[in-house]
């Protein structure tokens, strides 16, 4: 592989790095050492692969969406079915790996942040599996939006802490989880949920999620005899996208498209389009594109989908954009809801609202491509968690 990042200081070009208090520096360095060692440890890799296959249910299918393709009227659309994983999303690819890493480091407790609740559920799941004590921080707004996932986490034995500070969403949950980690660093591992945070987290999460792209690349070659012409994924922090993109990074013929949440529209204040509208800053221990005002205060991100409303983006995505290796687009709430319904009706698949952003852009892109071309879209999660929210929204529209 010719592309190599991060450098030894955890930078992807000018993005990334390690901006943490002294109290955490020892912990992130210890984590980095343990992680690098685990990569060449056959016993660790064997155990990881065992749980991915037998517990998570990998590999996931690469499904030819025939009716969706016909609807778009262009390139063949293949769906990488991460919604079929145990717990219903891509998040568990990463939590399994990090829980095994925590165990290797002798840490019996884990802490995590969650927005939509998917990462919280995936963390609580592996904590139950490996008999670890688990604390999850979740913004008060998200606790309301995703009450079912809160109950799921509690069923799995986790303690869910509702965060009432700031905008009471994902950003604030990360702040509190980091504070908790600082106070309990000796016996606790922080399971970061996306390609964010101080080095080595973006690298660790990318590598554990790369199973998505590794499988998709192999499966597409088997089905089509060539690589896809384009790959598409939604981007909040950006872990499902990075998991799909990274194994294709040296395949210059494969266009990579990340899709952010445009909320009510980029011209409004209600969006989460960090790459389109952000400026470079430091958030949660790394240099990244951040939504901020002229005084450098972090703005609230907004999206119908709780998993996309993060005001930053993984540093490697910003690096890909600067290199011209990936293009980033945005899709509004209304477009995502339309795509959600479209996939339900054409393929009988209920996607997560996060993934619906990718579907929306993919259909537009496919329609401009030739029938002999093909694309892979990451269906990052299933939509059970969103059905209630959607029901209220659609009923609200019919009652207006």
UniProtKB/Swiss-Prot annotation:
The record's InterPro entries line, in alphabetical order, gives: Trp_synth_b_CS, Trp_synth_beta, Trp_synth_beta/beta-like, TrpB-like_PALP, TrpB-like_PALP_sf
Q: What class of enzyme is it?
A: lyase
Pathway, according to UniProt? Amino-acid biosynthesis; L-tryptophan biosynthesis; L-tryptophan from chorismate: step 5/5
Domain of life from the UniProt record: Bacteria
Question: What cofactor does its activity depend on?
Answer: pyridoxal 5'-phosphate
What does the protein in this record do?
Answer: The beta subunit is responsible for the synthesis of L-tryptophan from indole and L-serine.
Q: Which GO terms describe its cellular component?
A: cytoplasm
Quote the protein name from its UniProt record.
Answer: Tryptophan synthase beta chain
Q: What is its EC number?
A: 4.2.1.20
What residues bear N6-(pyridoxal phosphate)lysine in this entry?
91
Q: Which protein family is named in the record?
A: Belongs to the TrpB family.
Give the GO biological process terms.
L-tryptophan biosynthetic process
Q: Spell out the Pfam families in the cross-references.
A: PALP
Which gene specifies this protein's sequence? trpB
Mind listing the GO molecular function terms for this protein? tryptophan synthase activity
UniProt keywords (A-Z) are:
Amino-acid biosynthesis, Aromatic amino acid biosynthesis, Lyase, Pyridoxal phosphate, Tryptophan biosynthesis
Catalyses which reaction?
A: (1S,2R)-1-C-(indol-3-yl)glycerol 3-phosphate + L-serine = D-glyceraldehyde 3-phosphate + L-tryptophan + H2O
Q: How does it assemble?
A: Tetramer of two alpha and two beta chains.
